[in-house]
Each structure stands twice: as structure tokens, then as C-alpha cells.
């Protein structure tokens, strides 16, 4: 999908530097100082327009959230949503997920959210999928010995691929739903895509896996 250029985006992000962190690598290993507390940190890779992360932050004030979004034209919308929500436990980073271990120390992150990631359906693009083994390794590098991935998608092919990828990587599947909205999901915060697909009657697939790297070190 082609993103519309927003020439004002740089100025907007600079004006909201308390939310959109411009040089996140400087905080590697000390994100607690950014939030002013030692609460656990959860990240969302591919934060999009920010509905999920701002909702989660409001629902869980004792957890710190960091959203990762590659596209500047999208993250500006997320910044505005965080501002409108009034949540103070959210920061947003305009970076590539490939650079996670440049930004976070091992063990600094407790949970990774992957919501409606691009399925990259062509085989030649497999390495771009956020549940491909090289990305799982990056999540491992920032979570350390324990951690979790919470994964949602409307794409059955990506879901099946991801379950296989998780299993081959040695992760433990703790929850799985083939139709999330018909299984009474407690505390579920919907993304913009989730609202759209759910309204069309499409099932939403969800999985939780535990990161038990100590079993493989």
C-alpha cells in the first residue's frame, strides 16, 4: 500500500517529541528513565494509526507501551491518537523493526504485539513477514529469557504460517482462537483493521506464545 506523503510530518513529530522519540537508541537499556518508573514494557511492532496502543495504555496504566511504526505518514496519526487519549504511558518510534536490538537491551521488553501485519503472501517475500524466524530472533534479543508474543490477523494463510514458525522456533503456544470475536475475548482492544474486518463478518485469528529462551540457550 502506497503511503501519502505528509510534508508537515517532520515538524509535527518534532513538536511532539515527548511522545515520538526522535533518537531512541540513546535510551537503550534505560527506557525506565523515559517513563519515570520501572513498570514492564510492551511493544507493538507495526503500530499503524495507534488505536490499539492508545487503548491498551488507557486500560493498563501500570504497563508502559512503545509503538514501532516504519511509515512517518502513519505514525503522525498515532501520535495524535495518543495525545487525544490522555495516556502518559506510551511512546512511539519511527523506526524499522530490523533495528529493535539497537534500541532495546536484552530483557528490557516483556511482550511483543503483532497486529494485522502485512502477510507478504508471495514466497519470495517470506523474509519480510514479522513472524519469520529472523524477526523472532530479534524479539528474542530484546526479551531475553522470558516473554510473550500476542498475534492477531484476519489472514488465515499468515496465521497458519505463523503457528508453524512459532513451533519451529521452539515457542510454546498458550492460547489460540480461530474466531476471536465469537470467543468472548476479555479486554480485547480492536485495531482499525480489526473493526473493519470484523464488521464484514471475517473471523479474526489470534495466538499467544510464550518466549522460553532459557530452554534453548
From Swiss-Prot:
* InterPro entries according to UniProt: SAM-dependent_MTases_sf, tRNA_(Gua-N-7)_MeTrfase_Trmb, tRNA_methyltr_TrmB_bact
Query: Is S-adenosyl-L-methionine found in the keyword set?
Result: yes
Substrates-to-products reaction catalysed: guanosine(46) in tRNA + S-adenosyl-L-methionine = N(7)-methylguanosine(46) in tRNA + S-adenosyl-L-homocysteine
UniProt-annotated catalytic positions: 118
Q: What keywords does the record list, in alphabetical order?
A: Methyltransferase, S-adenosyl-L-methionine, Transferase, tRNA processing
What Enzyme Commission number(s) does the record list for this chain? 2.1.1.33
**Residues that bind S-adenosyl-L-methionine, according to the entry?**
44, 69, 96, 118
What are the annotated disulfide bridges?
none
Q: Where is this region: Interaction with RNA?
A: 124-129
Q: Which Gene3D superfamilies match?
A: Vaccinia Virus protein VP39 (3.40.50.150)
Task: Please state the pathway this protein functions in, per its UniProt record.
Answer: tRNA modification; N(7)-methylguanine-tRNA biosynthesis
Enzyme class, broadest EC rank: transferase
Cellular component annotations (GO), alphabetically ordered: tRNA methyltransferase complex
Query: Which residues are noted in the entry as substrate-binding?
Result: 122, 154, 191-194
| A molecular function (GO) term | tRNA (guanine(46)-N7)-methyltransferase activity
Q: Does the keyword Chaperone apply?
A: no
Concerning its family, UniProt says:
Belongs to the class I-like SAM-binding methyltransferase superfamily. TrmB family.
Query: What does this protein's UniProt record list under function?
Result: Catalyzes the formation of N(7)-methylguanine at position 46 (m7G46) in tRNA.
Name of the molecule in the record: tRNA (guanine-N(7)-)-methyltransferase
Amino acid at each position: 500500500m502506497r503511503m501519502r506523503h505528509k510534508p508537515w510530518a517532520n515538524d509535527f513529530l518534532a513538536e511532539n517529541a515527548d511522545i515520538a522519540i526522535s533518537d531512541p537508541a540513546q535510551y537503550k537499556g534505560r527506557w525506565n528513565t523515559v517513563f519515570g518508573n520501572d513498570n514492564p514494557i510492551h511493544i507493538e511492532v507495526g503500530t499503524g494509526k495507534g488505536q490499539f496502543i492508545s487503548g491498551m495504555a488507557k486500560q493498563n496504566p501500570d504497563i508502559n507501551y512503545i509503538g514501532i511504526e516504519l511509515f512517518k505518514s502513519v505514525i503522525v496519526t498515532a501520535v495524535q491518537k495518543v495525545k487525544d487519549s490522555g495516556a502518559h504511558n506510551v511512546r512511539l518510534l519511527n523506526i524499522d523493526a530490523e533495528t529493535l536490538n539497537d534500541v532495546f537491551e536484552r530483557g528490557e521488553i516483556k511482550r511483543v504485539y503483532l497486529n494485522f501485519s502485512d502477510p507478504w503472501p508471495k514466497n519470495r517475500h517470506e523474509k519480510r513477514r514479522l513472524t519469520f524466524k529472523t524477526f523472532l530472533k530479534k524479539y528474542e534479543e530484546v526479551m531475553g529469557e522470558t516473554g510473550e508474543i500476542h498475534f492477531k490477523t484476519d489472514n488465515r494463510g499468515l496465521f497458519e504460517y505463523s503457528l508453524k514458525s512459532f513451533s519451529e522456533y521452539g515457542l510454546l503456544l498458550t492460547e489460540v482462537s480461530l474466531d476471536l470475536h465469537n470467543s468472548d475475548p476479555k479486554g480485547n482492544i480492536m485495531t482499525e483493521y480489526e473493526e473493519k474486518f470484523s464488521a464484514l463478518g471475517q473471523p479474526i485469528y489470534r495466538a499467544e506464545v510464550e518466549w522460553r529462551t532459557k530452554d534453548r540457550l
